[in-house]
Amino acid sequence: ELFFDYAQETGAKVAVYRFPNLMGHSRPKYNSAVSTFCWAVANDEPFTVNDRSTELELLYIDDLVEGMFDLLENKEKHCEFDGVETVLKEDGRYCFVPLTHKVTLGEIVDLLQKFKQQPITLMMPKMPDGSFAKKLYSLYLTYLPTDKFKYTLKMNVDNRGSFTELVHTEDC
């Protein structure tokens, strides 16, 4: 309320955000379950998920930065809140970044396990642009030790030549 009062009294522009859980590279085993899971899976460390059905609303750090650029260009999104739910409202007092992802802990861990198995199965989950999977994969790679970036590929050779499969997708 102090900021809103200040804006009212001075005419200054004030932008108040209430962010959901942020997701980006951070110290594992500190304050981010997602970073901890990424680090643990990438480094073969044990971890515990108490309830796979627990849902998180996550905002990826790159999307947060994009939202801040929108604010600087006067393109921010406004809202009000109904409890913790964001209600889009053009003349709302609050601002928000609309690119969030609601996912369960189980979905996060399952995706991370698929990423970990990719060098063995060559199977890559669907990762459309802007998807949670693509953002999680980008984060996972930041925790992957450099020696795990390379792996042996099988070359198929016959009288026609050679062929090496690098990756499979679920659709092909």
Spans of model-derived segments:
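Substrate-positioning beta->alpha
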Residues: 28-36, 53-74, 106-110
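Phosphate/oxyanion-binding loops and surfaces in catalytic or ligand/nucleic-acid-binding neighborhoods
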Residues: 40-47, 70-78, 111-119, 166-169
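Active-site Tyr-X1-5-Lys
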Residues: 1-16, 32-43
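A conserved pocket-lining segment of Rossmann-fold NAD(P)-dependent short-chain dehydrogenase/reductase
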Residues: 16-21, 39-59, 79, 88-98
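A short glycine-rich, His/Asp/Glu-containing loop-to-beta-strand
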Residues: 146-172
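Conserved catalytic-site region of short-chain dehydrogenase/reductase
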Residues: 22-26
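Mid/C-terminal beta-alpha module of Rossmann-like enzyme folds, strongest
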Residues: 74-155
